[in-house]
Amino acid sequence: MQNSTCQAVGECRVPEHAVLPQPLYREVVQFIESLPQKEGHLVTVLHKAQSVFGYLPIEVQQFVADHMEVPLAQVYGVVSFYTFFTMVPKGKYPISVCMGTACFVKGADKVVHAFKEQLKIDIGDVTPDGRFSIDTLRCVGGCALAPIVMVGEKVYGNVTPGQVKKILAEY
């Protein structure tokens, strides 16, 4: 096992990858090995890793760095830069409320408040049972349906605070 402390810049290592199920790591390795070359595919590999694990904790970032033969700092830089990557687990049913201009003007902030009240969590949090998480996003491109809520891949248009309970009941 490698050191879990930093001796010099670029030498930080985390403990062995024991937190998450090993078959998931094998799936990521197989994906990396299927690439014609590693160079230039870090974002693609991170997307795959996030789809496999659901998020990108430091253990997964280190694993990707090791297998892509790049520094952990480079992986972390990419993960922390792009908003579509997350380092914290999401709920089984992630809720995203569009806060783009059209959605905001039509009451998206009130819809967010209704979800927060119903679930008793704040933006970025996960319910204690792991079922739901709430986040906001910028413009999903369906302005005619504002305000828009996404639960996983399912899109709800013209959502009002009064519909929040009904939406949650579907899950």
From Swiss-Prot:
Record field: catalytic activity: H2 + NADP(+) = NADPH + H(+)
List ligand-binding residues for [2Fe-2S] cluster: C98, C103, C139, C143
Keyword Methyltransferase, does the record have it? no
Which cofactors go with this protein?
[2Fe-2S] cluster
- Coiled coil region boundaries: none
**Activity: how regulated:** Inhibited by oxygen.
PANTHER family according to UniProt: NADH-QUINONE OXIDOREDUCTASE, E SUBUNIT, POTENTIAL NAD-REDUCING HYDROGENASE SUBUNIT
Q: Identify this protein by name.
A: NADP-reducing hydrogenase subunit HndA
Enzyme Commission no: 1.12.1.3
The GO molecular function terms of this record are: 2 iron, 2 sulfur cluster binding; hydrogen dehydrogenase (NADP+) activity; metal ion binding
Q: What class of enzyme is it?
A: oxidoreductase
What's known about how pH impacts activity here?
Optimum pH is 8.
Known function: Catalyzes the reduction of NADP in the presence of molecular H(2) to yield NADPH.
Q: Please give the organism.
A: Solidesulfovibrio fructosivorans
Write down how the cofactor binds this protein.
Answer: Binds 1 [2Fe-2S] cluster.
What keywords were assigned to this record?
2Fe-2S, Iron, Iron-sulfur, Metal-binding, NADP, Oxidoreductase
